[in-house]
Amino acid sequence: MRTILISGSSRGIGLNIAHKELKEGNRISVGIRNLESLKGSVIDPNKWPEGRIIINHYDALRKITAENWIKNTVDEFGGFDSVINCSGVLSKVPFLYKDGDEEDILNTLNINFLAIWHLCRLSWDHLCTSGRGRIIVLVSMSGKRSKGDLAAYSSSKFALM
């Protein structure tokens, strides 16, 4: 059994990965912005035996929430051996962006790149202690082939490759 931190698991690929890991018998600690978003979902903690899933508030733009998430996971599960990074944002900022788009570009880079780097760095000692640590980062083909209006998104995904 693995114990896995999964970011961005309230919908989409992250939700499906979290569900798959639970079905395979693993314990998961999910980090999401909206704690209520899992009610009624396939990973609603009320649908699983106690001790299989914990829900943590995680805002990729606030490093303290990553620190708290890791601490809560270690306190509850005794540690973890995997981190799966699924959180991210899609922003439509073209390569020839307009003045004023810099904030959107920085937000995209902070969430899609720096937050993942921070979470992995904060997790590193725990992953090493487990003796079988794994880091999985979801990227996108857009990181290799940029479309005109996805320059910020593509740059943030390329930075992860």
Describe the predicted segments one by one.
Residues 24, 76-77, 94, 122-131:
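A short helix-coil junction within the Rossmann-fold of NAD(P)-dependent oxidoreductases
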Residues 140:
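Residue(s) in the substrate-gating loop at a strand-loop-helix junction
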Residues 10-11:
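Conserved glycine-rich cofactor-binding loop
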Residues 90-106, 149-152:
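Conserved mid-core segment of classical short-chain dehydrogenase/reductases
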Residues 48-62:
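Rossmann-fold cofactor-recognition segment
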Residues 24-41:
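Conserved glycine-rich Rossmann-like NAD(P)H-binding loop of the short-chain dehydrogenase/reductase
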Residues 120, 156:
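Active-site helix of classical SDR
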